[in-house]
């Protein structure tokens, strides 16, 4: 299929060198080049096949794939690996402690509880001590081991320990490692973290070949020992499913091996027989699917040209499919109905701000630590946004809260740093009757109304704004004028002050300390006791020994918990903090 979506056919005949005309598709350009190089069985006008054409001598040009490889009865295991450096130019990972914390999150175990790391001799490993031991290492290794039939295995922990012992034997050194098994995906898998030092304390260097092939082979041997060989009918069934899959498959790997550097593949049988008939049948079926996808084209009887961009396109399609499944599952679990046509997979270059309800967040790539968030946008679309790491969520609200994706970096930065900023910890429904100054109240009083869609979350916000205005009128904070509600002046300050006074009175009764508000220009000083999540935002409790104040919280304060802090109350409710020698403006 070409760029216009219409089917095309390669017609035998002489290639004409006319200039101008319509632009040719990538496949047609490759076919033209291949014909010149002799990779085509197309006949010339006289009916005789020119010598050299269709008789490729490339070693990988003919049916070079092996039935043994495709129909292997060994249990398959996917192993992904990454070397995470702790410093230097290649340092891109979140701290090991943060990575460990996320691996232990709730919802990844059999019962949905918080996971627990294990080690060689203990089912409850001290992962914090493991991170502490490795903080001065040059690097560590992250492995994801995913047996295809993990659900049938008796004990993934025992399997992991056997695999780690085999690694130690292969590498000739003891290993310091921790691991955790995850059951939150279609196929259970193990995260294995190995310190980057050997038993003598020297840097541990593992050959790329062992990481790429050796470890996987060892894992497959262990699974095959436990479960036995895979029945041929199961192998065949899996390959038949691969024929029509819109992702990178084992069949595509074999096609890549069999093709030459131009993408030409010859599937004409050298010696027809049962030995390769099944493999060839599957390959042809797969190539026909690639043709329908616009990624391959027939070049003659039993001959094909595969677009050089096919692998990347298939991998991108597979990734897109995984993202769509993640988004659909997230919206379904939260009880929201959003059509796939409204899904947007962001690339980090969105022209307009992404603001909306947080539907889900997690690890996009558990190996690299890349994170993602699913946002039900005020523009009526469902956004999937990727972040460099889970540290982008450090101060984000819980699922259901209101968020905004913020960009940090220059305007021409191709990969700006993205942070998920909280706009409200309170979900939309609760804001309608909440006591403080809500995110909805800010929408009611802003001079330039936020653009809101007529469907999806945008419409939900429209309805919630109307309901909030009606509630404020009932509370005496506005009056009706026909179909409109005229709100009182200083609405936000009034609502914020009411909530702080109510919370301050409650805390005063609990602590026995008097509550005192902070006036503009007033010096605020004392011990930072706790953070409070209120309708009006996040506030810090500052105890000066004689009483306490509730002032706007800001991220730099969190590291000062239990310590003495000081600052000056600014207009608009912010505090300009003096933390050591650095002054921070808390808004």
What residue ranges belong to the model's regions?
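N-terminal nicking endonuclease/strand-transfer module with a His-rich metal-binding environment
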Residues: 1-188, 193-587
């Amino acid at each position: 299929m070409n760029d216009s979506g219409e089917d095309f056919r390669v017609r035998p005949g002489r290639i004409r060198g006319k200039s101008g005309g319509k632009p040719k598709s990538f496949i047609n350009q490759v076919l033209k080049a291949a014909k010149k190089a002799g990779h085509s069985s197309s006949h010339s006008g006289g009916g005789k096949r020119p010598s050299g054409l269709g008789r490729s001598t490339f070693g990988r040009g003919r049916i070079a794939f092996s039935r043994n490889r495709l129909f292997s009865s060994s249990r398959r295991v996917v192993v992904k690996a990454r070397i995470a450096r702790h410093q230097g130019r290649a340092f891109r990972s979140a701290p090991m402690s943060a990575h460990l914390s996320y691996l232990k999150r709730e919802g990844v175990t059999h019962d949905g509880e918080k996971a627990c790391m294990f080690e060689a001799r203990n089912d409850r490993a001290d992962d914090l001590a493991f991170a502490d031991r490795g903080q001065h290492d040059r690097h560590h290794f992250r492995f994801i081991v995913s047996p295809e039939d993990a659900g049938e295995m008796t004990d993934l922990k025992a399997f992991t320990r056997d695999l780690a012992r085999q690694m130690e034997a292969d590498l000739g050194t003891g290993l310091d490692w921790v691991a955790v098994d995850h059951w939150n995906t279609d196929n259970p898998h193990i995260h294995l973290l190995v310190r980057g030092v050997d038993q003598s304390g020297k840097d541990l260097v593992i050959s790329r070949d062992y990481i790429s092939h050796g470890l996987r082979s060892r894992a497959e041997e262990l699974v095959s020992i436990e479960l036995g060989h895979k029945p041929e009918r199961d192998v065949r069934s899996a390959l038949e499913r691969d024929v029509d899959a819109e992702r990178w498959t084992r069949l595509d790997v074999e096609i890549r091996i069999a093709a030459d550097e131009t993408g030409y593949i010859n599937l004409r049988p050298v010696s027809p027989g049962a030995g390769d008939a099944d493999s060839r049948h599957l390959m042809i079926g797969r190539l026909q699917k690639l043709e329908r996808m616009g990624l391959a084209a027939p070049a003659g009887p039993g001959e094909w040209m595969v677009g050089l961009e096919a692998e990347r396109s298939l991998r991108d399609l597979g990734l897109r499919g995984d993202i769509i499944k993640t988004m659909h599952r997230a919206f379904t679990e939260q009880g929201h109905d959003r059509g796939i046509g409204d899904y947007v997979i962001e690339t980090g270059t969105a022209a307009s701000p992404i603001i909306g309800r947080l539907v889900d967040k997690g690890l996009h790539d558990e190996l690299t630590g890349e994170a993602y968030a699913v946002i039900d946008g005020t523009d009526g679309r469902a956004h999937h946004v990727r972040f460099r790491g889970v540290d982008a969520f450090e101060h984000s609200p819980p699922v259901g809260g209101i968020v905004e994706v913020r960009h940090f970096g220059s305007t021409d930065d191709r990969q700006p740093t993205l942070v998920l900023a909280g706009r409200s910890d309170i979900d939309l429904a609760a804001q309608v009757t909440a006591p403080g100054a809500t995110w909805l109240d800010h929408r009611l009083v802003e001079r330039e109304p936020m653009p809101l869609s007529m469907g999806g979350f945008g419409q939900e916000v429209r309805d919630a704004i109307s309901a909030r205005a009606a509630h404020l009128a009932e509370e005496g904070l506005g009056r009706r004028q026909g179909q409109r509600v005229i709100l009182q002046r200083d609405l936000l300050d009034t609502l914020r002050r009411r909530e702080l006074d109510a919370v301050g009175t409650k805390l005063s009764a609990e602590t026995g300390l008097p509550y005192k508000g902070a006036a503009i220009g007033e010096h605020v000083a004392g011990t930072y006791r706790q953070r409070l999540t209120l309708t009006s935002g996040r506030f810090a409790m500052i105890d000066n020994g004689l009483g306490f104040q509730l002032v706007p919280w800001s991220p730099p304060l969190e590291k000062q918990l239990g310590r003495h802090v000081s600052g000056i109350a600014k207009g608009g409710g912010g505090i300009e903090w003096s933390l050591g020698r650095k002054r921070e403006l808390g808004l």
